[in-house]
Amino acid sequence: MLAGTLLLLTACEQQTRRLTSSLEPDSADLHITEAPWESQAQMTRRMNHVTTYLKNATGLKVRYVPAINYAHSYALVERGEADLILVGIYGGYRLLKALPNAVPLVVQKPSYRLVMLGHRRWLEELETDEEPGLASVTGRRVGFGSRFSGSAFLQPLLAMQREGLTSADIDECLHEPVQRHLPAQVANGMVDFVFIPSHTDKNDQFIPEPLRDELAIVWTGPLDRNDYLIGVNKPMDKKQQSNLQKVQQAFLELDRTADDGRAVLDAYMLPGFELPTSQFPEATNHRIEALLSGSGGLPTCEAS
């Protein structure tokens, strides 16, 4: 499937990789990056699992290129400094729109679920005729992930859109790039609700143990997808095409029967990967396009 997709892509200006001055002469076959949705130490540990697995599965040397923030991770791909990127729905939408040679290689098997957290006291004090749910954000203070996060900002906006809500219905909001810090924003009273992703059957997986008595799940979305792997094809570079196909196949074969594969899936809390479908990311990107065109671009919690 990938081979046909890659060959059908029209040639465009080949990008030159600009390696950072701190790197020695580069012997890597491919470079991979990811938006830093957790601390850099955690990102590095996770990527070490990925590059080790890919080395064992394909024989390729894949170098991890750390990103300063979400926007920087996208820029690394746009500038040709990374050939592969693990993205959520916003990063994928942005890169596939900006780069004609960007190709979705694999997508996560359905395992993503959006979770809305509130204070347990608020839930207990609701009137009997009040139903907690997504509409509860109206007129409230809400915490999201990074403005460029798919799982913790764009996914909530899409969920709100399906309920006839927009970001204008929220009183105040804030962005917290490190998603694991979001539950504490409710506990300390900075916001009334936060949106966090769940990647397992445990929807409260990101609620820290000390906060479990204070916080409660207000609403959960349906089982869905958010993450996928994008590769940048170079139409005239047959070796690059072959390398991308090897990486694609390695991700498709990821399972927990071997230690290195189990380490990757456990690090990302995913059941595995499969080929892209007409629904994801294609149909999802159409919904994102409609959302952004209707709101004049990507909303933000920052004051203008």
Please describe what each predicted stretch is.
Residues 140-240:
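Pocket-lining segment of extracytoplasmic ligand-binding domains
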Residues 3-75, 259-304:
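N-terminal hydrophobic or amphipathic helices and topogenic motifs
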Residues 34, 66-70, 81-100, 108, ...:
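Beta->alpha turn/N-cap motifs
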